[in-house]
Amino acid sequence: MPLYLPDDETFASFWPGDNPSLLAALQNVLRQEHSGYIYIWSREGAGRSHLLHAACAELSQRGDAVGYVPLDKRTWFVPEVLEGMEQLALVCIDNIECVAGDEPWEMAIFNLYNRILESGKTRLLITGDRPPRQLNLGLPDLASRLDWGQIYKLQPLSDEDKLQALQLRARLRGFEMPEDVCRFLLKRLDREMRSLFMTLDQLDHASITAQRKLTIPFVKEILKL
């Protein structure tokens, strides 16, 4: 399965907020040469996909083979796509809640997990919108397997952390996002980070096109606020 991931979702562009332990655990698993498993759960939009993309990017840059399976897009492929993935250096399964109750997918994930345990060399990262025991899986053995490893809740960012995350993403894109503009966006817009980053992209494009710096009046004009 071809791997197409956002090139701006790396560990360098992820603002940690109250998640230093999770980031340390991820880095530790990625550094080690043997298998390791981490389950990350959070509400939608907290950044769990970003972390999987970042993990894939880091190992890909080392020349390692990785696999990323977004189960919210499972209609694009079949459960058999997991066959042979135990030979990769890293497997990331995103949004496992999307296949709760889907027997073929649950069995495919369970079998992959067991093959990874046997291989002893593949790192496995899985995300969901709730802890493993609350996923309402139809296969009890899979729920048990998912509960075995390190389990972390990805804590949402505070408003101050969101401000820092916006400014960090802007700097990585090569421009400055003034603090007053950030606070204006947080006050007037949906504060879910994915939405805020999309707005940031829109403002970056508008700023380049108009050859203007980002100010509150300019932002109001572009976003029609």
UniProtKB/Swiss-Prot annotation:
Pfam families: Bac_DnaA, Hda_lid
GO process annotations (BP): DNA replication initiation; negative regulation of DNA-templated DNA replication initiation
Keywords: DNA replication, DNA replication inhibitor
Entry-linked Gene3D superfamilies: 1.10.8.60, P-loop containing nucleotide triphosphate hydrolases
Keyword Coiled coil: no
Keyword Endoplasmic reticulum: no
Family, as annotated: Belongs to the DnaA family. HdA subfamily.
Protein purpose: Mediates the interaction of DNA replication initiator protein DnaA with DNA polymerase subunit beta sliding clamp (dnaN). Stimulates hydrolysis of ATP-DnaA to ADP-DnaA, rendering DnaA inactive for reinitiation, a process called regulatory inhibition of DnaA or RIDA.
Subunit architecture: The active form seems to be an ADP-bound monomer. Forms the RIDA complex (regulatory inactivation of DnaA) of ATP-DnaA, ADP-Hda and the DNA-loaded beta sliding clamp (dnaN).
Protein known as: DnaA regulatory inactivator Hda
Gene, per the UniProt record: hda
